Curated annotation (Swiss-Prot):
This is Mitochondrial glycine transporter. The gene is mic-13. Mitochondrial glycine transporter that imports glycine into the mitochondrial matrix. Plays an important role in providing glycine for the first enzymatic step in heme biosynthesis, the condensation of glycine with succinyl-CoA to produce 5-aminolevulinate (ALA) in the mitochondrial matrix. It is a multi-pass membrane protein. It catalyses: glycine(in) = glycine(out). It comes from Neurospora crassa (strain ATCC 24698 / 74-OR23-1A / CBS 708.71 / DSM 1257 / FGSC 987).
């Protein structure tokens, strides 16, 4: 396998499996926060304290109630992450290869002296590099595609978590939606979801990549001793492990970048999330994004657009940071094994 074909990225299977694993893990660990966010957003009168009191008084008790809806959440987040990361990597690879205007600038190498700054091209990632515009577009397109595919599971998850519906099983919930609303019911709120998720994902990838770059420069890894000129040049070009950080340093930078990016993007996109939740829970009362927004603002004021922000911000910060860190580390390991042994022997 040529270096060019190796640099095109790991097999899509690796990205799918890595995305699936990271998504399922984050969904299970953070399900209580997601459930509380849904309860707070389901009406303008709910507060976190009221939601917790309601869960404590339920027949199941507080702890089991906090993990209600874990299965649809894990399925949605797991397969959503798998589809998203696979699609994102495919878009970034093809954009880097075929669209020079979206590709990241190549690293500058002091060819005359053969010397580069020790930390100039260190990276915490093995993923394709794009320009700011490329990252913004790639993230938005990949998230919109994954969101459409997983929309039925999203509707089931939100309704299962809500106290408005007394579903006892996913199959029963699906039958009820199909009977009362038809196929359209499984895509309730997709417009608000797409408008929320596409900008969120695009901005997230943009901020995430820029944050990794800045943190890598702020906290450089000590240079390896006695590197030859050839090794140094290869490291700068990203052609071997010389341009990669240690596992712990890379994971720390990726996690911190994920938290920062999620907080910023959650604040920007929360109004769309609040509207989307109302549409999915009460489709007869909130028919579409424009009507729902007007009704919420007229009846409850601007504050209704920020319902659940603290919970959503907490969950997004942790879930995004965890998912991206686990995903990137699995891909780094796969890339390393690919380089050493060849693709046919690689196991995540």
């Amino acid at each position: 396998m040529s270096d060019g074909s190796r640099k095109s990225g790991t097999k899509s299977t690796f990205h799918f499996v890595a995305g699936l694993g990271s998504g399922v893990l984050s969904a299970i660990l953070l399900q209580p926060i997601d459930l509380l966010k849904t309860r707070v957003q389901q009406s303008g009168k709910h507060s976190l304290r009221a939601a917790l009191a309601e869960l404590r008084s339920s027949q199941q008790g507080l702890l089991p109630s906090l993990w209600r809806g874990t299965l649809p959440s894990a399925l949605r987040t797991g397969f959503g992450s798998a589809i998203y990361f696979t699609t994102l990597n495919t878009i970034r690879e093809n954009a880097a290869r075929h669209l020079p205007s979206l590709a990241a600038a190549a690293p500058t190498i002091a060819a005359a002296s053969g010397i580069v700054a020790p930390n100039a091209n260190q990276t915490s990632s093995s993923l394709p590099k794009l320009s700011n515009t490329g990252n913004l577009l790639a993230g938005a397109v990949a998230r919109s595609f994954a969101g459409f595919i997983l929309m039925p599971l999203t509707v089931l998850k939100v309704r299962y978590e809500s106290s408005f519906y007394k579903y006892t099983s996913l199959a029963g919930a699906a039958r009820d939606i199909a009977r009362t609303e038809g196929a359209r019911g499984f895509f309730a709120g997709f417009g608000a979801t797409a408008i929320r998720d596409a900008p969120y994902a695009g901005l997230y990838v943009l901020f995430y990549e820029k944050s990794k770059q800045h943190l890598s420069n702020l906290f450089p890894q000590p240079p390896q001793p006695q590197l030859s000129t050839t090794t140094t040049l290869e490291a700068a070009a990203g052609q071997d492990g010389g341009g990669r950080m240690s596992q712990s340093r890379a994971a720390s930078i990726n996690f911190a970048s994920g938290v920062f990016s999620a907080i910023i993007c959650s604040i920007i996109s929360n109004p769309f999330d609040a509207v989307k939740t109302r549409i999915q829970l009460q489709p007869k009362k909130y028919r579409n994004m424009v009507q729902a927004s007007r009704k919420m603002l007229a009846e409850e004021g601007v504050r209704s657009m920020m319902d659940g922000l603290a919970l959503r911000m907490s969950r997004k910060a942790m879930s995004s940071a965890l998912a991206w860190t686990v995903y990137e580390e699995l891909i780094r390991r796969a890339e390393g094994a690919w380089t050493k042994r060849g693709p046919e022997e690689v196991q995540l």
